[in-house]
Amino acid sequence: MIKLFHINKIFQQGARSINALSDISLHVPQGQIYGVIGSSGAGKSTLIRCVNMLERPTSGQVLVNGQDLTILSDSDLTRARRRIGMIFQHFNLLSSRTVFGNIALPLELDNIPKAEIKKRVDELLELVGLTDKHDAYPANLSGGQKQRVAIARALANSPKVLLCDEATSALDPATTRSILELLKDINRRLGLTILLITHEMDVVKRICDQVAVISGGQLIEQDIVSEVFSHPKTPIAQAFIQSTLHLDIPEDYVQKMQSHPAPNLSPLLKLEFTGQSVDAPLISMAVRRFNIDMNILSSQIDYAGGVKFGVMLAELHGENGGVESTIKFLQDHHVKVEVLGYV
């Protein structure tokens, strides 16, 4: 549905050339939700704007719905863009128009008959859950409601693809969840292909089928979400995943923790579980097998792409090599073990 081949984008700043995107290739299958994640300045927005040619790549091919947009004439590109919807972090609604008027605008520009416009807008209002806001103005809407209007407007011409440029960044967590659920519902109901960019791994975790990680204008990792969460291949991907699961060491432990082992101290471990290691009773197995005691201080488990992953802070007590054997046992069963200190 969306195929990018060797996309490069160079911006000229005086005599200086800035490589915003370097040799990026990716494929978004039809009907999937594909996330692109990266830090600020990584090139995410430039990439998504290349998909509908708001930014023209310096080189490379952009195929959407089987068409190479980079070789289309201006008139053909305008027609192709009607099948590509887009929403932004800022809603860009017309304050002088009602909700109905904002959604109807793309249809009016296409000279669609009024009766058809009314029918289509009513369908979209029901789809996004705003049937009671037909005559409301943007000033009287919440942030989440404004984004729902923007989504409805983006769907007015029945696009095959929806591009989401940091669409939830300006929203509070509860509203973000509701907008993500709406996008997932639209994807399921309409078979819509969605490409979204974000700097939040929680967004990817909640709705994406596949994810690509971008850094410094380069695509450094891409795979199905469950694989990236289970086996991240780059430090940047690992950092994004850890941002979704973060456990703080209790203050009293921070104050008494030592950096080196001693006869009267026990190791404080951070254990990271992914995939099968989450479901296996590894802790109870280790306690029985190596005759150790484990004091679990805190833990958290979450899901992404149908795969569970989790993190745990635990204090480990044992004798006669039990601690070392336990750590090796856990590592052999694909648990990442980090000794944070000794308490």
From Swiss-Prot:
Gene3D superfamilies: 3.30.70.260, P-loop containing nucleotide triphosphate hydrolases (3.40.50.300). One of its GO terms (molecular function) is ABC-type D-methionine transporter activity. GO terms for cellular component: Gram-negative-bacterium-type cell wall; plasma membrane. ATP binds at residues 38-45. It catalyses: L-methionine(out) + ATP + H2O = L-methionine(in) + ADP + phosphate + H(+); D-methionine(out) + ATP + H2O = D-methionine(in) + ADP + phosphate + H(+). Transmembrane segments: none annotated. Residues 2-241 form the ABC transporter domain. Keywords: Amino-acid transport, ATP-binding, Cell inner membrane, Cell membrane, Membrane, Nucleotide-binding, Translocase, Transport. Its EC number is 7.4.2.11. The keyword Transport applies. It is found in: Cell inner membrane. It is a peripheral membrane protein. It holds the Pfam family NIL. It is an enzyme of class 7 (translocase). The complex is composed of two ATP-binding proteins (MetN), two transmembrane proteins (MetI) and a solute-binding protein (MetQ). Part of the ABC transporter complex MetNIQ involved in methionine import. Responsible for energy coupling to the transport system. Belongs to the ABC transporter superfamily. Methionine importer (TC 3.A.1.24) family. This is Methionine import ATP-binding protein MetN. It comes from Photorhabdus laumondii subsp. laumondii (strain DSM 15139 / CIP 105565 / TT01). The gene is metN.
